[in-house]
Amino acid sequence: MDNNTNISTFVQKSATLRAVGTYCYVWVVDDFYSSTAGENKVDSAIAQEYADAFDKMYPMITNVFGNESDKIYYYGWRNMEDYSSTGTKINIVVYDIGNDYSLSENQQCGIVGYFYAKDYFYNYSEKGVTSNNGKYFYIDSGYANSNFDTTISTLAHEFQHMVNYNQKTVLNDGLTSGQWYNEMLSMLCEDMMQEHLGIKDEDSPKARTTTFNAYYYYSGISEYNSKNQICSYATAFSFGSFIARNFGGAELVQKISKNSYVDNDSITNAVNSLNGTKYTYDDLFEKYLLALFGDSTYTHNKDADCTLEYNSGDYSSNPYEYPMTAYNIFDSEYSFSANGKKYYGPAIFYANAKSVDLRPENGILIHGIGTFSGSSVSVSFSSGTSAEKIYLIIK
């Protein structure tokens, strides 16, 4: 397991099985277990809470996204139960991610959990990274103690990554998606599971909207900018949540997850397949731009269609419909401050604004031209590169 905040050095540690679920084992690294939970040490009761919570969400998530792989790679894909000591159960390992625990959360690496596909490769060992040979993801013990809501939402997020590895890579001969696309799907998983998990908006991906409004121009919609990761998460969720709320909700996400495409092609194919349309990606991008200007037809501020249901377990008599609820990107809760002023909605650049480079992969810069009256107006643009597009939006 990792031993530094960059998740670049790994060490071997002993862990003990502290909870067993229908679909999972919860292991706690011995250094971070205590009979009484506190700070970065968890007890068996907390481990069981997470096992129980994961057991409930597992069939709900797989109903939408599909299943994780029961294969492990060893000179070809082989049955995991023949090569893994934990069989086909999912292993949730709890410890201090980054080995950086502090009583002050802002001194931690900020990683609540992660999935690492190395564990799907039998006896893999390279540059200090070694496979645990099975289905694994990892949860931070400090967060597991202090913030159940964030941690349980992270379990849903990381499980989607595990499922996505199967749906896109294992089942499609090594197909690889962009990281932004994978993160988008994981945040949409959190989004549709929010009501079931009892998560407040401030602990959900919707909370990224403030970052999006203030800094969307630091990451293209279809980009994962390693220097501004927080902005890439925000732009990916903004676009993905718009697509889900306007073109089919959880049923659309199901098609995105399960089709044999990735990235923009996957999204476009799923939208057209579900809606009987012939949109290009550029068509969808244009509609998304309208939402950033407060359009009432294409908007984040509408509930997604609820056409997909889960009707088992706790929901056998009252099906769960995977609600993805409306949120207004112009609300005060998503406002930001700059130069002593408060702003609502995505930042608009005017003539005296700072210079910002347009990001690749569908980067956006919103420029305000001004307010006009009268029957006609002429607006002139200087020509840019062939890769740049200018959209003129009049309100």
Q: What residues fall within each predicted segment?
A:
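Zymogen propeptides/activation segments of proteases
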Residues: 1-41, 51, 60-64, 376-378, ...
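Glycine-centered structural positions embedded in regular secondary structure
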Residues: 8, 15-17, 113, 234-236, ...
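Juxtacatalytic substrate-recognition/specificity segment
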Residues: 22-178, 185, 196-197
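Non-transmembrane alpha-helical segments in soluble domains
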Residues: 51, 58, 62, 156, ...
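Surface-exposed intrinsically disordered loops and tails
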Residues: 76-77, 86, 105-132, 136, ...
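Acidic/His/Gly-enriched intrinsically disordered linker/tail segments
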Residues: 149, 153-154, 169-242, 246, ...
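Acidic/polar loop patches that form or flank catalytic/metal-binding clefts of enzymes
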Residues: 201, 251-254, 282-283, 300
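Beta/coil-rich, acidic/histidine-enriched accessory regions frequently appended to metallopeptidases
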Residues: 262-395
